[in-house]
Curated annotation (Swiss-Prot):
Stored InterPro entries: Thiolase, Thiolase-like, Thiolase_acyl_enz_int_AS, Thiolase_AS, Thiolase_C, Thiolase_CS, Thiolase_N
Organism the protein comes from: Mycobacterium bovis (strain ATCC BAA-935 / AF2122/97)
Protein name: Probable acetyl-CoA acetyltransferase
Molecular functions per Gene Ontology: acetyl-CoA C-acetyltransferase activity
Disulfide bonds: none
Length: 389
């Protein structure tokens, strides 16, 4: 069961959260999740946090976050890296451990500071005798560059668009709608149940409170996006506007078995169902969420038309569009409050963010079935079925 969860507002690259490490953001999210669950830190038995960009982050980022959140030194922690799938995999692993009776209470989530990703001087340990030296960007090299085809994942997605035939206007319209829906959701207070403010210290005076995702542009239109240049190929259809934003943030959920929750007198947002995990046949991204959802649906024994809430990570507009088309989804139930194109995509966090958001939607409905799904670098996909608590 997902008892409760919390996330930070998402900051833009070099934005409001630029001075926070991933672990510091993770600690804020963990503490917030425990408070929303009304669960004391002393009950937590294990912590699992996803993080992709760990170079320079120090030993055991998940444990750093756990200890900073007030969880005891006697509680083990695990940092996992499955690229964009890390945050959803953390929840799935927590569920599996609880079902195996290893633990009763697990905190799972994801954290990322893409701003803090350092640059890498490869082979420096063996020294350089002569000539120029190349410095690599950890964010690009270990986060956004496809290792199998040696090109940015956006360029790889552009290649697949040649097959899928999504037009520039289709992608621009989808991206504009993501911003518009996210802006409307903030205005209507939809995110209030999940976002906790972050206090940002100032040189003098009281800290400022960072309270809202800062990448959302309420006045975004498809016409405005049509003026952007292609990002990965001169004749391409993907722009900075139809790709997810580079961002900082963290999210966490409290996962618990039903017996423990009942013993503590707690309610829960959603019950965790089947987990769909897929890969291949190559490293492209577009079909992976749909493939993972199909696998999860099959394991759950339900059909796609039984889904009420669908959250698909908007790595690119083309990924969400492919998922909708391949599954035959009603677009009206997909990312109803916007997605990563608008709010941002801190790599290790996003899987937890969309799972929490789907769980909260189901809780507000009081019934129904949902799914959260993402594509991941290397051509992988994960999906998690949720049922209203």
């Amino acid at each position: 069961m997902i008892v409760a969860g919390a996330r930070t507002p998402i900051g833009k690259l070099m934005g409001s959260l630029k001075d926070f490490s991933a672990s510091e953001l993770g600690a804020i999210a963990i503490k917030g999740a425990l408070e929303k669950a009304n669960v004391p830190a002393s009950l937590v038995e294990y912590v699992i946090m996803g993080q992709v960009l760990t170079a320079g982050a120090g030993q055991m980022p998940a444990r750093q976050a756990a200890v900073a959140a007030g969880i005891g030194w006697d509680v083990p922690a695990l940092t996992i890296n499955k690229m964009c799938l890390s945050g959803i995999d953390a929840i799935a692993l927590a569920d599996q451990l609880i079902r195996a009776r290893e633990f009763d209470v697990v905190v799972a989530g994801g954290q990322e500071s893409m701003t803090k990703a350092p640059h890498l001087l490869m082979n420096s340990r063996s020294g350089y005798k002569y000539g120029d030296v190349t410095v690599l960007d950890h964010m690009a090299y270990d986060g956004l560059h496809d290792v199998f085809t040696d090109q940015p994942m956006g360029a790889l997605t552009e290649q697949r668009n040649d097959v899928d035939m999504f037009t520039r206007s289709e992608q621009d319209e989808y991206a504009a709608a993501s911003h518009q829906k996210a802006a409307a959701a903030w205005k209507d207070g939809v995110f209030a149940d999940e976002v906790i403010p972050v206090n940002i210290p100032q040189r003098t005076g009281d800290p400022l409170q960072f309270t809202e995702d800062e990448g959302i542009r309420a006045n975004t239109t498809a016409a405005a996006l049509a003026g952007l240049k292609p990002a990965f190929r001169g004749d391409g259809t993907i722009t900075a506007g139809s790709a997810s934003q580079i961002s900082d943030g963290a999210a966490a959920v409290v996962v618990m078995n039903q017996e423990k929750a009942q013993e503590l007198g707690l309610t829960w947002l959603a019950e965790i169902g089947a987990h769909g995990v897929v890969a291949g046949p190559d490293s492209t991204l577009q079909s992976q969420p749909a493939n993972a959802i199909n696998k999860a649906l099959d394991r759950e024994g339900i059909s796609v038309d039984q889904l009420d809430v669908v959250e698909i990570n908007e790595a690119f507009a083309a990924v969400a569009l492919a998922s909708i088309r391949e599954l035959g989804l009603n677009p009206q139930i997909v990312n109803v409050n916007g997605g990563a194109i608008a709010v941002g995509h801190p790599l290790g966090m996003s899987g937890t963010r969309i799972t929490l958001h789907a769980a909260l939607q189901l809780a507000r409905r009081g019934s129904g079935v949902g799914v959260a799904a993402l594509c991941g670098a290397g051509g992988q996909g994960d999906a998690l079925i949720l049922r209203a608590g």
